[in-house]
Amino acid sequence: MIVQPKVRGFICTTAHPEGCARHVGEWINYAKQEPSLTGGPQKVLIIGASTGFGLASRIVAAFGAGAKTIGVFFERPASGKRTASPGWYNTAAFEKTALAAGLYAKSINGDAFSDEIKQQTIDLIQKDWQGGVDLVIYSIASPRRVHPRTGEIFNSVLKPIGQTYHNKTVDVMTGEVSPVSIEPATEKEIRDTEAVMGGDDWALWINALFKYNCLAEGVKTVAFTYIGPELTHAVYRNGTIGRAKLHLEKTARELDTQLESALSGQALISVNKALVTQASAAIPVVPLYISLLYKIMKEKNIHEGCIEQMWRLFKERLYSNQNIPTDSEGRIRIDDWEMREDVQAEIKRLWESINTGNVETVSDIAGYREDFYKLFGFGLNGIDYERGVEIEKAIPSITVTPENPE
């Protein structure tokens, strides 16, 4: 069938299989063109492996270091006239290309927060790898979590803490810049967001992997966070998500102590740059900030996407054969170019004057839109979007059954 983008609010409800495959192919080509990673990881588990930083780290591990990879995610196969989710198509393309290159690549589709999926993953690691996982990437972005032990349901929210936040935001599709006010979160919303987006599940994963002897001596585990400039702090760093990320950082310190003493391992937080993702598109203020950031970083020739960021994380931080450079809080900073003084000063200056009339020229909102559509496989060169495509795509390692998530 012919697949066109259908955008509702912050998400696109369709995905293009060939476009997603082309996008994954571009990332793979980038990883292959860079000099290969020496001393890189060999057996990598990526939790949240189908889009964004998780997918990019899977590609860098596989095609940059020749690593075997297992990816865990929660995606939807095609059903009737409904396309699969982009992460499904991304993984189908990744696995197909990895297998053709002689690389081990298997995936598990289901709720990463559940004990059942953790056990399935452990069983696969024991059966196929006999343990020995030397890198665990934790890259989950989810709006809700069911606690595996208590059954309690938590929903995350994106709100300020303490007082109403007033600023401006942009409707990315129309280019309309307007004032926005966001009411503060309740105590329950703060706690719930921490339960979903904090470090609780990361710790459950690492403890389970350790208990069943799945981790190698010297293992590294990395989770991602974002800090950003003062401009976004009220809604992000000092808001509910920021509170959850502080919990994630606290978890990293605890896991680091455990892994260091048991396996000479490390648990690390990587602070990444602001990028267009399905998650960031839903945050008020942030799309307008990213549109300005893209413009300035592209002009200075320091713009990076997910794949460039993950390449730099692996090459210059995790596997540089030197001590991993961190900030005073022990975090890896690959948001260093975004947070450069000259970049931030320019954004601050433009922020005051940006409005509906000048947003298309002052910012790179066109680049934001382009990246947004690319997430769903649209707007890629060399794809004929007027031609019908087969929307059912198989992921080689996954058997689709009616019980699989819809």
Curated annotation (Swiss-Prot):
EC category: oxidoreductase
UniProt: NAD(+) binding residues: 48-53, 74-75, 111-112, 140-141, 245, 275-277
Keywords: Fatty acid biosynthesis, Fatty acid metabolism, Lipid biosynthesis, Lipid metabolism, NAD, Oxidoreductase
Pathway of action: Lipid metabolism; fatty acid biosynthesis
EC identifiers of the protein: 1.3.1.9
InterPro entries from the UniProt entry: Eno_Rdtase_FAD-bd_dom, Enoyl-CoA_Rdtase_cat_dom, FabV-like_NADH_b, Trans-2-enoyl-CoA_reductase
GO MF annotations, alphabetized: enoyl-[acyl-carrier-protein] reductase (NADH) activity; NAD binding; trans-2-enoyl-CoA reductase (NADH) activity
A Pfam family assignment: Eno-Rase_NADH_b
The UniProt record lists the keyword Lipid biosynthesis: yes
Catalytic site positions: 236
Alphabetical list of PANTHER family matching this protein: ENOYL-[ACYL-CARRIER-PROTEIN] REDUCTASE [NADH] (PTHR37480:SF1)
Family: Belongs to the TER reductase family.
Function: Involved in the final reduction of the elongation cycle of fatty acid synthesis (FAS II). Catalyzes the reduction of a carbon-carbon double bond in an enoyl moiety that is covalently linked to an acyl carrier protein (ACP).
Designated name of the protein: Enoyl-[acyl-carrier-protein] reductase [NADH]
Organism whose genome encodes this protein: Coxiella burnetii (strain RSA 493 / Nine Mile phase I)
Taxonomic classification: Bacteria, Pseudomonadati, Pseudomonadota, Gammaproteobacteria, Legionellales
